[in-house]
């Protein structure tokens, strides 16, 4: 059995900024409205989101016998100006950075069977981080942490090992705030979901099609930070 406090201590030692642990159970539709999002076609041509939808909701379908999801946060500097390249892309390639730390954490914990997850595996990094008490899902659908706002990269270890204790989700800090919704120049945010067909980051990150004339890229060529810049939790960083 793994020690929750031991996991968190080692996670910090290998370079993460925060760590939480959740039991490997299915996410609810209210936590992660994936099916509703897909039914509306708000995923655009991100066809891969349709595949393995059940695994995205339940890590036990991703890793047979999974019992714990170890979620880790790596914060990055907020942008100093708007436009051009989004803040996450101005630092080292986060997939490599986060995965390298996850591999080190897995080795230190002695759980070689644990699956390393960072964006490219069919599991929702942000929703599991929320389940593990590291923050909450903002209206812009990103994880908002109390310490670093949404300027964070995420990764997980899904393991068959049980933990001696688990973290609990935090209450939302958004309350009646709608600043991120109002800030989006393309009105891409609605009902706590993103219509990627209206989202600048969809076009400037995936580059699968030209930006439509009615979508304002607002000067961004890689990603977009507009909704994050509007968030009060990001203004205190």
Segments the model singles out, each with a brief description of its role:
Residues 1-173, 216-219:
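Auxiliary alpha/beta "docking" domains used to position bulky ligands
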